């Protein structure tokens, strides 16, 4: 499940800042929770960079603890957080727009030949 920078619509639209990359990773995996090590590995982000911005996400309430497995703490996005709700809406709007643009390419007029 390697994660490539700039491959999502949200990152293409808003830019690949570390906070957005972390948030986007959770948006793309809404049913899963992850440890910090799993996030760093999947994002291929430096640990120093990750922890610099992770603290901001925790303080803002954007990420929450879901459970503990041994020494690992698992996290997910707090879908009740107001900022997260807006990011989800933006992500959905970007996806809808991209689908509409893609479907326009396949709409071709039908020509009927008369006999």
Residue spans of the language-model regions?
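A short acidic, leucine-rich amphipathic alpha-helix
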Residues: 38-42
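Short, hydrophobic-biased segments on the C-terminal half of alpha helices
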Residues: 54-56
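Short, cationic-aromatic polyanion-contact patches
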Residues: 9-19, 35, 66-90
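Amphipathic alpha-helical dimerization/coiled-coil segments
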Residues: 82-115
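Short helix-capping/hinge SLiMs at alpha-helix to coil transitions
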Residues: 13, 27-31
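Short coil turns linking two alpha-helices in DNA-binding domains
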Residues: 46-49
């Amino acid at each position: 499940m390697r994660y490539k920078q700039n491959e999502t619509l949200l990152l293409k639209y808003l830019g690949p800042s570390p906070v957005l990359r972390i948030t986007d990773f959770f948006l793309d995996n809404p049913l899963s929770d992850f440890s910090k090590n799993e996030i760093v590995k999947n994002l291929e982000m430096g640990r120093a960079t990750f922890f610099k911005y992770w603290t901001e996400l925790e303080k803002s309430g954007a990420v929450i603890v879901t459970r503990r497995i041994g020494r690992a703490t698992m996290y997910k996005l707090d879908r009740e957080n107001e900022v997260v709700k807006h990011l989800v809406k933006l992500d959905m709007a970007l996806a809808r727009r991209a689908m509409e643009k893609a479907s326009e390419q396949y709409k071709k007029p039908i020509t009927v030949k008369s006999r």
